[in-house]
Structures are given as structure tokens and as C-alpha cells.
């Protein structure tokens, strides 16, 4: 499965954990969850992306095996911010005889680590392109 998203996420200094962002595609849904209720300066914060797919659809692991393309994540961040990840869980085997691929059916949860600089604005934006 290959799809593109352009997502603009506005995060505030006091970001509430109950506030999530959801994006729907034709066969998948992305939910974004912050780790805690605040994004602090000079810290590491976990931003989790949950990808849910329709029955019969899947997405590939970082090493997709015999066929498919791995998910790639490109972030546009404010100056001084750094994003690493995702931290990949172990994949499922997805057989396409005679080929074997690796990925995720139904759902995958991918944590990213957002490192903030010593001084951050009260409001900032992150842009994610998921290919």
C-alpha cells in the first residue's frame, strides 16, 4: 500500500493528551497522540502515530522483504527541533507465494521522539509527509 499525506500539526506549549488528530485516507486512518500534556523546552517527547487499515490492506515494515516499499516519514520542523524514528515493532509475515513480505495488517503503532531546543515558542507547527 502506498499513500501520501500532508499533515500540519499545531502543537501548543500546554498540549493536552486528550487532544488527538485523526486523518482518514481511502483505506487507512492515522491517529496522532502526544506523550504527555506538555511539550517542554530542552526535552525528549514521544509522538505516537497509529495507522489503522481496512480489512485486506497492509503497510510495509522498514525492510519489506521480497516486494513492496517501506513507509518513509519526512518531517518539517521549527529551527532547533529534531525528530527521530519511528521505532518499529516486529512485523508480521505477509505471504504472496512465492514471495514473502513483512509488514502490518490492520494496525501498527509507531512512536517518534521529538527533541526540543532550550527555548521553544508557545505555539509551533510540525509538518509530516508520509509516503
Residues covered by each model-derived region:
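Extracellular/lumen-exposed scaffold segments
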Residues: 18-129
